Each structure stands twice: as structure tokens, then as C-alpha cells.
């Protein structure tokens, strides 16, 4: 009995299952911004497909390791000031600094972990 066809079908099925959630693209905006102390700052992040709430927000200062600020889209990491907040689910997420402080000057970025390489 020739088993090549079922094996090929199984391979296609596994490929389809494993590929269903790969290559999630994240689009963050704005790419840069100018703001003053005391300003409310908002950054958005959009996923190319539904990632539920599997999103982190990080702060990185020059020469330093990234610091986790927000996990699961909206949960504040212990010790992070309450002026930082996150919201959203599915494909659209928002990160907010309610009142910008001088020490907040940094690079901020989102990271999805619904599907990791």
C-alpha cells in the first residue's frame, strides 16, 4: 500500500496548523515624538492578527537593558510608577504616560508573545 499521499496530507495539515499563528507583525506609532514635562504621551501598537492580551511594553535607556513596564497588555510591573499604563486586546493596544517626567526620556516598544520565533 502506498503511504505517500497520507504522509503528504499530514505534512500539509501540520504546516497549516503551525503556520496559522506565525509571522505576527507589530506596528508601533508614532516612530518618534516630541513632548514636554507634564504632557500626556500615548503610543499605539497594532498586531497583524489577534494576540489576545499577550503584549508587553518596555522602556529602554541608552546603554541599559530593556525594562518591563507593562505585561499582559495592562498590568503594571511591580515598582513601576502609576503614571504608566497600558490597555487594549486583540490587535490594538495603547501605552500611556499620564504626566511625562524628565526621567521618562527613553525608547519605548511593544512586544507580542502570543507567537515567538
Curated annotation (Swiss-Prot):
GO cellular component: blood microparticle; extracellular region; immunoglobulin complex; plasma membrane
KW RNA-binding (keyword) present: no
Disulfide bonds: 45-110
Keywords: Adaptive immunity, Bence-Jones protein, Cell membrane, Disulfide bond, Immunity, Immunoglobulin, Immunoglobulin domain, Membrane, Secreted, Signal
GO term, biological process aspect, one: immune response
Signal sequence, start to end: 1-22
InterPro entries in alphabetical order: Ig-like_dom, Ig-like_dom_sf, Ig-like_fold, Ig_sub, Ig_V-set, IgV_Light_Chain
Subcellular location: Secreted; Cell membrane
Region (Complementarity-determining-3): 111-117
Region described as Complementarity-determining-2: spans on this chain: 72-78
SUPFAM superfamilies noted in UniProt: Immunoglobulin (SSF48726)
Boundaries of every Ig-like domain copy: 24-117
GO molecular function terms noted in the UniProt entry: antigen binding; identical protein binding
Principal location listed in the UniProt entry: secreted
Region span, Framework-1: 23-45
Annotated spans, Framework-3: 79-110
Region (Complementarity-determining-1): 46-56
CDD domains, alphabetized: IgV_L_kappa
Region of interest (Framework-2), residue spans: 57-71
Quaternary structure and partners: Immunoglobulins are composed of two identical heavy chains and two identical light chains; disulfide-linked.
Record function comment: V region of the variable domain of immunoglobulin light chains that participates in the antigen recognition. Immunoglobulins, also known as antibodies, are membrane-bound or secreted glycoproteins produced by B lymphocytes. In the recognition phase of humoral immunity, the membrane-bound immunoglobulins serve as receptors which, upon binding of a specific antigen, trigger the clonal expansion and differentiation of B lymphocytes into immunoglobulins-secreting plasma cells.
Protein name in UniProt: Immunoglobulin kappa variable 1-33
Species, as recorded: Homo sapiens
Amino acid at each position: 500500500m502506498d503511504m505517500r499521499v497520507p504522509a503528504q496530507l499530514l505534512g500539509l495539515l501540520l504546516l497549516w496548523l503551525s503556520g496559522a499563528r506565525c509571522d505576527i507583525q507589530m506596528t508601533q506609532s508614532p516612530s518618534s515624538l516630541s513632548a514636554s514635562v507634564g504632557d500626556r504621551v500615548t503610543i499605539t501598537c497594532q498586531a497583524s492578527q489577534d494576540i489576545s492580551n499577550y503584549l508587553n511594553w518596555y522602556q529602554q535607556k541608552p546603554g541599559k537593558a530593556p525594562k518591563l513596564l507593562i505585561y499582559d497588555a495592562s498590568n503594571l510591573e511591580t515598582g513601576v510608577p502609576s503614571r504608566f499604563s497600558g490597555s487594549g486586546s486583540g490587535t490594538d493596544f495603547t501605552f500611556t504616560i499620564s504626566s511625562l517626567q524628565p526621567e521618562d526620556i527613553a525608547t519605548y516598544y511593544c512586544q507580542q508573545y502570543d507567537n515567538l520565533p
